[in-house]
A protein has these predicted regions:
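C-terminal helical "tail/cap" subdomain of flavin- and related membrane-associated enzymes
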Residues: 192-276
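Residues in and immediately flanking transmembrane alpha helices
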Residues: 19, 180, 186, 234-235
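FAD/FMN-dependent oxidoreductases across multiple families
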Residues: 74-193, 199-201
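Predominantly flavin-linked oxidoreductase catalytic cores and closely associated redox partners
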Residues: 1-105, 113-115, 121-132
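A general structural signal for well-ordered alpha-helical segments in protein cores
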Residues: 26, 81, 162, 217-220, ...
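Short flexible/disordered coil segments
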Residues: 37-42, 46, 129-132, 136, ...
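Fold-independent oxyanion-binding glycine-rich loops
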Residues: 5-7, 48-50, 60, 69, ...
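Short, function-defining helix-loop hinge/capping sites that tune catalysis or transport
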Residues: 14-15, 175, 181, 216
């Protein structure tokens, strides 16, 4: 029996299920940086101006994890790294001065800010923060699967004597890149099949359990990072959520994993009429 849970770069998956094209892979990279001097270290998610993907700041016990995720076929390291630094500097600047903008003027346009960019007091604050961070950050990078809808129909990740789990199987949310839940759930489903002596049932079990959700997310991905009423869909989505409590609640549940993609249209329609 062969079970592979060795990530998106799994050589076992390439051999047994076939290699995925770059268009079905995402790149995530970032920095582990010190906690802000103030006690305020919020979680922040920011959609990238002019790019597919998003940036994040996730505080941990002893550091803040900053990162960017985008599709591998659109990946350009230099401008994305500059955009991430712009986001990081804005994050720390806001901890020291709540009036400071998250993005520099260039970063807000999705362009390289060339470090701290701009001029005046904001320029000086970002420059001093950058000097401190350059000496203390630790870099990391990873690949994340983001399968196309049709790939879910054709790609097998299990057989009579083998199985792929988690990222090795391509089990990650194509919209957000989240994969921890699917890694744990696929392991649980496989364990049930193995203990029952029915390993070949694993393929059917994962498809019935969460396969439709992942495929639905994959179909929604292009729309999610597209445009709506003359602006990026993500910007319109935030505007609607700010104004409407029902939409705000639904999006919060979607991000938290409490609302599935399959039923999200119906939920939004109901809550648009009855917000509570």
């Amino acid at each position: 029996m062969l079970v592979a849970a060795d990530g998106a770069n799994s050589p076992v998956a390439r051999r047994l299920a076939g290699a995925l094209p770059n268009s079905e892979m995402e790149v995530a990279f970032g920095y582990r940086a010190p906690l802000p001097k103030s006690a305020d270290a919020p979680t922040v998610i920011a959609f990238l101006p002019g790019w597919v993907g998003y940036a994040w700041a996730f505080p941990r016990l002893d550091h803040v994890s900053f990162g960017i995720a985008t599709t591998q076929d659109a990946f350009e390291h230099r401008p994305l790294d500059a955009l991430l630094w712009d986001f990081m500097l804005g994050y720390y600047a806001q901890r020291e001065d709540p009036r400071a903008p998250l993005w520099s003027p260039a970063g807000a346009r999705g362009e390289s800010a060339g470090g701290h960019g701009g001029g005046g007091a904001g320029h000086d604050l970002r420059a001093s923060i950058e000097l401190r961070l350059r000496e203390s950050v630790e870099r990391y990078a990873a690949r994340i699967p983001g399968l196309a809808p049709e790939t879910f129909d054709t790609r097998r990740v299990g057989g009579d004597d083998w199985a792929l789990l988690g990222d090795a199987a391509g089990f990650a949310d194509p919209v957000t890149g989240e994969g921890i839940y699917y890694a744990l759930r696929s392991a649980e489903l496989f364990a049930d099949c193995y203990l029952a002596g029915r390993v070949a049932d694993y393929e059917r079990r994962w498809r019935a359990d969460f396969g439709r959700e992942l495929q639905r997310a994959s179909r929604m991905r292009r729309r999610f990072y597209g445009h709506f009423v003359g602006a990026p869909f993500t910007s319109r989505m935030i505007d609607f959520a700010r104004l409407h409590p029902g939409i705000r609640r639904t999006l919060r549940e979607l991000v938290a994993g409490d609302q599935g993609y399959v039923g999200v249209k119906r939920t939004l329609a109901l809550r648009a009429l009855w917000p509570r």
